[in-house]
UniProtKB/Swiss-Prot annotation:
Shikimate binds at S24, L25, S26, T71, N96, D111, Y235. This is Shikimate dehydrogenase (NADP(+)). Pathway: Metabolic intermediate biosynthesis; chorismate biosynthesis; chorismate from D-erythrose 4-phosphate and phosphoenolpyruvate: step 4/7. The active site is at K75. NADP(+) binds at G136, A137, G138, G139, A140, N160, R161, T162, V163, D164, R165, L233, G256. It catalyses: shikimate + NADP(+) = 3-dehydroshikimate + NADPH + H(+). Involved in the biosynthesis of the chorismate, which leads to the biosynthesis of aromatic amino acids. Catalyzes the reversible NADPH linked reduction of 3-dehydroshikimate (DHSA) to yield shikimate (SA). Keywords: Amino-acid biosynthesis, Aromatic amino acid biosynthesis, NADP, Oxidoreductase.
Length: 290
């Protein structure tokens, strides 16, 4: 689904800054949404190397750009340029959405809320009183674990190849939110033990992401149980080998497409004040992944 965009002197500009950005699905997703609602907006992708971040952000504000999505490697560095941060951005320690408003640079993080909205939509999952096992300890794992913790999760286990990094995240979760959290390695037996009474498994690593779709998953069907929800944050491909393992186990598989769409929908609403056409955005993403 290619989207033609009409631009005039009154078109509102939003966009993405990162390095690199050429494979991003965000322009297709947002421009489809603007067209659906008849909004005079255009979404562009800007490749900004780290040494030019401050100039790009301040220049965008001066040019009257409405807002920006922020991706790797700028999510942490851009925080220093923001005049205001929302609670999620402060907790997670990263910004993925910027809004230029009233002469200020406002920073938000919609990743955690996008993750939870997608999960609730597909499974009716309620984090309260639950146990989750998170694979990975990077930016996506931080967003997911802090959102689960602030929404009432009882226990969060961070599993990472570098256990020290997982331990730092677990300590932050305990200190900032007061949730029961601990760290483990990626040893299969240890993960299997933790999954026995877990409600949710989230893979926040790039394992299985295009072009490495055939990479073996970190968890297999024999380590899962049928009451487990398995959410792979990888969205390309939409159906990963981990999700195939979940199906074999009778568990509930959840693709990463939903988180991508909902974090974008939340940014859309911050910029436009309009309710995002989520299904149009989802279809635009899936069309580009086919």
């Amino acid at each position: 689904m290619s989207v033609s965009v009409s631009v005039d002197a009154e078109t509102n500009v939003v966009g993405l800054i990162g390095h690199p950005v050429e494979h991003s699905l965000s322009p297709a997703m947002h421009n489809a949404a603007f067209k659906e609602l008849g909004l005079n907006y255009v979404y562009l992708a800007f490749d900004v190397p780290p040494e030019r971040l401050e100039g790009a952000v301040r220049g965008a504000a001066d040019l009257g750009i409405v807002g920006l999505n922020v991706t790797i490697p700028h999510k942490e560095a851009v925080m220093e340029l923001c005049d205001e941060l929302d609670r999620d951005a402060e907790l997670i320690g990263a910004v993925n959405t910027v809004r230029f408003s009233r002469g200020k640079i406002e920073g938000f993080n919609t990743d955690g809320e996008g993750f939870l909205r997608a999960l609730r939509e597909e499974t009716y999952f309620d984090p309260r009183g639950t146990k989750s096992v998170i694979l990975g300890a990077g930016g996506a794992a931080r967003a997911v674990s802090f959102k689960l913790a602030t929404e009432g999760a009882d226990e969060i286990v961070i599993a990472n190849r570098t256990v020290d990094r997982a331990e730092r995240l677990a300590e932050e979760l305990k200190e900032k939110v007061g949730v029961k959290a601990r760290a483990i390695g990626l040893d299969g037996d240890e993960i299997e033990r933790e999954l026995r009474d877990a409600d949710l498994l989230v893979d926040a690593t790039p394992v299985g992401m295009y072009p490495n779709e055939d990479e073996p998953p970190l968890v297999t069907a024999d380590q899962m149980h049928e009451d487990l929800i398995v959410n792979d944050l990888v969205y390309n491909p939409p159906r990963t080998r981990l999700l195939e393992e979940a199906e074999k186990a009778g568990a509930t598989p959840v693709s990463g497409v939903g988180m991508l769409v909902y974090q974008g929908a939340l940014a859309f609403e911050l910029w436009t004040g309009e309710e995002a056409p989520v299904e149009v955005m989802r279809e635009a993403v899936l069309e580009h992944l086919r």
